[in-house]
Amino acid sequence: MANRSIRDGDNPELLEERRMATFDTDKMAAVIYGSEEFARRRREITDAVSKIPELADIKPYPFLTREEKVTEGTRKISILTKYLNQLIDRDNEEESLHLHREVIGYEGHPFALHDALFIPTLQSQASDEQQEKWLERARRREIIGCYAQTELGHGSNLRNLETTAVYDIASQEFVLHTPTTTALKWWPGALGKSCNYALVVAELIIKRNNYGPHFFMVQLRDEKTHIPLKGVTVGDIGPKMNFNAADNGYLGLNNLRVPRTNLLMRHCKVEADGTYVKPPHAKIGYSGMVKIRSQMAMEQGLFLAHALTIAARYSAVRRQGHLDDKQVEVKVLDYQTQQHRLFPSLARAYAFIFTGFETIHLYSQLLKDVDMGNTSGMADLHALTSGLKSVVAHETGEGIEQARMACGGHGYSMASYISVVYGIAIGGCTYEGENMVMLLQLARYLVKSVELIKAGKAKKLGPVASYLADKSDETDLTSLNGYVKMFENMARRQAWKATEKFLKLMESGESREVAWNKSAVELTRASRLHTRLFIIEAFMRRVSRIEDIPVKEVLTDLLHLHVNYELLDVATYALEFMSFTQLDYVRDQLYLYLEKIRPNAVSLVDSFQISDMQLRSVLGRRDGHVYENLFKWAKSSPLNNADVLPSVEKYLKPMMEKAKL
């Protein structure tokens, strides 16, 4: 079998690992990225980028100031725009995303939200006439846009957004206004200094009637001078935990007037006389958010893959301590504790990516259905992606932090780059909806499903919730399907338990809101179990369709590791369905599959095919030459430009001289 990462001159420690591969890493990459064609295109794009010197980092990112990071991201994006047509198919979103990650990494750039939310929202919410006016300009990058929804005082609670858009019938204009400090738009990427347009989410008000949040196309800056327009207050919100090459911003609007036709009108409309034509589905305007959430499982899986590539490779290079042979130190990756720290997260990375394929497909199908006037799948996908967004982002953060600690002291260095990946990934716990709020949105769906069953209407359940009506308590763990049944038992029991608590509180006289709040912890637990069940099923479905036998065998091992680890992780919910003997069996199976995965561990992370340019890690570099390059990296620190720092001359030397007196 072939690990395609082998090159002459590699560290012998990694060469030894790669020669143990039982599968072809290119074929595994085709499974990870959905097709042989796209896996090949990723490699071609990576190779092409490596031949353009202008796109190389001017110096390691950790040594750049914030302003230098913003400038570097902007420099690269301007150069990249020049080469786009020869590097990628501009209509291929996957190719574009890979190219930008290859060149810019995770630090951010002015077109991140432009491509991820601004353009997709125009595609899904703007009428044909509006798309003709704005969409091609956005695609050509004549204008730079952002998505301005979150406010300083309100994030996930869209019902209480303060920004208003009052319709003036006489002038046929909307008057947009942020009446308070807490109404300021806050956080949108590129809003601070880069973008000149924004899709502003504001409360639509006609004749004092509030029709809820709607999208408005708003010009913020003059297209020639880039100076903010009158009535627009805009700026950068300052440094963040990470993503500091992005100018996340604030926006205030002081009675800014825009034409009536700047309301995005694909699904709703305001006539000249103020007549409001409502959309076919109340949440159809949220399709942009649903898209982001549908992509998040895959995106977070790739963040986790990035960190694990670094940690697994370094763990195969690092030797410390002894086992049987007292003359040779052992590879850190041979310790069971290190395997237990990394391999379950590796299984999750694959599981999240495979789950992402399913949700992206479901979103694509939803768009087709909506165009045909069918919005029946909206609630199901909204609930599913809400749960996935929360569970996957949280578990990814946990896995990345474990990967960092698995690298020992060097993991704490910015040379590892893991802390950067962590800072980006855990942003997913709050952007596009705070995690607890997302779990509770899924919980509403689960409660409604249980109520349907109680009312004898189980046939109305969506396919994802149909197990809630099952009465089987099967506990056979001799097959993967048995593990699925066990998770169904746990998720069903918790969903019913949480729903019954909620209903009993209302029966006792509590208001619906208070009863919901008092049941919230149990409801979020139900949502997590439901989501983890879906992830396991998605992993199983993907593995079942693989045709290459060696690839299928190693992914089956990874799947077995995953289901055993996940079951142990939530074992308190399983105790009423399984014996302690079965629990011991699950634990033994986990340790067995840690051993089975060990020979393929490095090849499994190599299969993600993350280049050194994108990896940006001294510890995880492909050739494994860690120590000499760590020394080289340290010497490049700007503090080493002078043997004696000005601060030493100014403060320390006088202090020490004074102490001698």
Swiss-Prot record:
Binding site for FAD: 147-150, 155-156, 189, 318, 338-341, 409, 434
UniProt pathway: Lipid metabolism; peroxisomal fatty acid beta-oxidation
This protein's record includes keyword Flavoprotein: yes
UniProt xrefs under Gene3D superfamilies: Acyl-CoA dehydrogenase/oxidase, N-terminal domain, Butyryl-CoA Dehydrogenase, subunit A, domain 2, Butyryl-CoA Dehydrogenase, subunit A, domain 3
Binding residues annotated for substrate, in chain numbering: 283-286, 293, 431-432
Class of enzymatic activity (EC top level): oxidoreductase
InterPro entries, sorted: ACOX_C_alpha1, Acyl-CoA_ox_N, Acyl-CoA_Oxase/DH_mid-dom_sf, Acyl-CoA_oxidase, Acyl-CoA_oxidase_C, AcylCo_DH-like_C, AcylCoA_DH/ox_N_sf, AcylCoA_DH/oxidase_NM_dom_sf
Motif (Microbody targeting signal): 659-661
Needed cofactors: FAD
Principal location: other
GO cellular component terms, A-Z: peroxisome
Subunit structure, interactors included: Homodimer. Forms a heterodimer with acox-1.1.
Protein name (Swiss-Prot/TrEMBL): Acyl-coenzyme A oxidase acox-1.2
Gene: acox-1.2
